[in-house]
């Protein structure tokens, strides 16, 4: 007896294959965010250009933290979005949350570089105000934006303000502020030393740990986004530059890990 098989199963197979395949190879309206790097600022990134300004060799290291964000022009495929979704160190955000409509990568990079430059200027102002109050013997008359050299290609945004300030204060004072520690930080800074929130704090905690930092300063405004189960690093939430410096100078080094300074931890 001859058997004749229906073509329907094959058509259904093809239909369902295309049904699942097409979304995977089609662009989706999302942005991918992943941990970036912890970049050490000493001795090459953060430098003082003027030989007339007295500086001291740091005993320790400070790290600028970054995150990796897909660009405004990037086409994220469905398969890439799924791969990100199943990873713990990858986050998806709607494109409209991260970027304005009709913006471009060039525009966003220019904006980020301007924010970085402004954060360096604010850090210098905050440093001078802190030194004037706490180290009056330090001559701050020659300190200015033009005396500072920062070499950070392909990095932008305002979140380096806090760690720039900590690095500069350690540069200009003879006191052993870092005491051999590896300190990371992420937060905006104002001229009067107030520390503001930044984006991607969870990813930056991962970057700090990979860099080998033992302490990470974060804005108290970010507490709601800091994970409860942080391990392997001390995350210290602060509101001002003064609080960060007090912690470094007054709190004994220990092997404690986790989060301090927050009452409302997030996910």
Language-model features: locations:
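Peripheral, non-AAA+ core regions of ATP-driven protein-machinery
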Residues: 2-267
């Amino acid at each position: 007896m001859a058997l004749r098989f229906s073509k329907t199963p094959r058509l259904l197979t093809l239909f369902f294959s295309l049904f699942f395949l097409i979304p995977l190879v089609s662009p989706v309206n999302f942005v991918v965010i992943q941990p970036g790097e912890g970049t050490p600022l000493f001795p090459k990134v953060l430098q003082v250009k003027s030989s007339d300004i007295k500086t001291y060799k740091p005993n320790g290291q400070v790290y600028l933290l970054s995150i990796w964000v897909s660009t405004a022009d990037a086409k994220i495929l469905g398969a890439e979005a799924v791969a990100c979704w199943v990873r713990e160190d990858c986050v998806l955000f709607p494109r409209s949350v991260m970027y304005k409509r009709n913006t471009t990568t060039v525009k966003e990079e220019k904006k980020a570089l301007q924010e970085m430059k402004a954060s360096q200027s604010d850090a210098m102002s905050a440093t001078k105000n802190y030194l004037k109050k706490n180290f009056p013997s330090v001559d701050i008359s020659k300190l200015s934006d033009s005396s500072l050299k920062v070499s950070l290609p392909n990095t932008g945004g305002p979140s380096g303000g806090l760690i720039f300030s900590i690095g500069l204060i350690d540069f200009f004072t003879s006191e052993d502020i870092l005491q051999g520690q590896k300190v990371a930080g992420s937060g905006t800074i104002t001229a009067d030393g107030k520390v503001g929130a930044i984006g991607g704090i969870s990813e930056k905690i991962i970057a700090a740990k990979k860099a080998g930092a033992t302490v990470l300063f974060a804005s108290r405004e970010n507490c709601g986004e800091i994970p409860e189960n942080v391990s392997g690093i001390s995350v210290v939430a602060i509101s001002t530059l003064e609080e960060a410096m007090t912690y470094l100078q007054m709190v004994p080094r220990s092997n404690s890990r986790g989060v301090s300074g927050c009452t409302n931890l997030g996910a």
